[in-house]
Amino acid sequence: MAGTADCQEHVARPRRPNICRVLRRTGYGKCLICSLLLVLCFFYATYCHVKHEAYSGSQPLLIYQHGPCAQGYNFVPIVFGLMLYIVYLMECWHSRTKIINMKKVRVEDALDYITALRTSPPIVWWKSVCYHYTRKTRQVTRYRNGDAVSATQVYYERVNSHQAGSMFIYDTCGFRDISKSILEVEKFHVTRIRLTRSFVFANMQAATEFEQQRSRFFNDNETKDDYMEVREGMDLSDVGFVEEILAFNCPTPPWFLHPIVFWFFSILVLSWPLRIYTEWRTAVLSFQVVKLFGTHYLSPNSINYTGPLTRTSTMDTVELEALLRREQHFVVPSYSEVMLMQNTIANSNTNFPNLRFLEPVIQPRPLVNTTNEHIVLRNYGATDTENSEQSSTVIPRPPPLRVSRSMTFAEENNDENLGFLENGNRRNRAIPSRGTVPLRSLSIGGISAWSNGYREIGREDSQFLIEPDEPPPPYEVALRMCAPLYERLRRSISSRLASISHSSSKDLKSLTLKNNNGAANNNNNNNNENPEEQP
């Protein structure tokens, strides 16, 4: 059903309007008003002639009659009617001119022309006219009180100094016609086809390429003179574009479109009914020629294929600036880094014990410290063994998950810990506990077994990221599965500097207080000794 609906939406069919729609859209108001006024003038003159014999010469001219048909008033509808009839004929001539200027072809020729429009490549062009104004003077003669007075008039004249044109080069992005198909045109005797043209972009890459070429052209020409006039449009190569086509199903046009019939009805002031009937019998088809740019970026067989767009590749720069202002600097690994973390550990030169696999246990994650101290990488599914006497309690293992597992960490400092692990009395934890063993940290950029303060990573502490029969996850899923390393370097450094400055200020204050107290004590002692020596 969905495919049928899509096919129906991508098909254009002519439709014949009803009477109400014809009256609402094409009412021909001027012709209707002129026709009604002419009819009123005709009835007014007829009434005066029948009722009062205003236009017969039998009554004497000296008799004065009162009313609308009196002498003099009876000629007003006649003169007014003649003027309206001239205006009415001019309006009919303008209406007929529109039909004459419209291109009239057979239905087969119209379909061939539309096919040529669909297959022709588009030409999106830009034109610029650079110009400036020059100040000029001229002598003019003016008359004041009958005397000719010459004066100097200052005016400005436009001077075009440079003209240039360019077009959109779409060899890299490619194009394709996505216009609708036309059906059921042969069912109607007369079909009015209204043609329009436009272009759209399949992705942001094509739109950006178009905007870059357009802005480059205008930027190169806007500095050539003071002002610049811009023109742009779209054409189709090797095919002249026609906005309206009148297609006939028969070799000859129908009777209501014949010029003799039109002028016969127009002379009888019946042009308005004929036009309404013509519009009602004519089917209307609105067809738009649409060209799609950027097809090479969507086709996997093309060398310019970029793949489906993700949110991370189309994120607006405003969102990135907002994240930077909030100091939320997430160091997120790429898809290849996530998938190659296991290979980095496996290919190192360290002697690893036998490989073991640990089942992951998902634990609620506590808050991350705001400083850089004791930051531990917490990946989705990461486990760690805790060497303590309280590790006898075994956490029940959840059912196997269908998600990719990250690295496993184990704390093995000596042979006792290894034996303890081999006995199977270990506790799986999503985050390493804070014990006597120093915590180890892992950076996303690279994994080193000889980092300062950290020990080697054993083979038995690690497990594969994905199962052998499990397909790799998408990039967005991998980002959500691998928790980012959250470090606020600015805040940690600033806090350390603040603490150092605070401690140094405290030390200086204490030293100054001690010096002041010592000086005061010495002064008191000297004062006490001086009175004893004076007597």
Swiss-Prot record:
Sequence segments annotated as region (Disordered): 498-535
Compositionally biased region (Low complexity): 510-529
DNA-binding is among the record's keywords: no
Pfam families for this protein: TMEM151
Membrane topology (UniProt): Multi-pass membrane protein
Subcellular location: Membrane
InterPro entries found in the cross-reference section: Tmem151
Keywords assigned by UniProt, alphabetized: Membrane, Transmembrane, Transmembrane helix
Cellular compartments per GO CC: membrane
Transmembrane stretches, start-end: 27-47, 73-93, 254-274
Keyword Membrane belongs to the record: yes
Family from the record: Belongs to the TMEM151 family.
Protein name per UniProt: Transmembrane protein 151 homolog
Species in which this protein is naturally found: Caenorhabditis briggsae
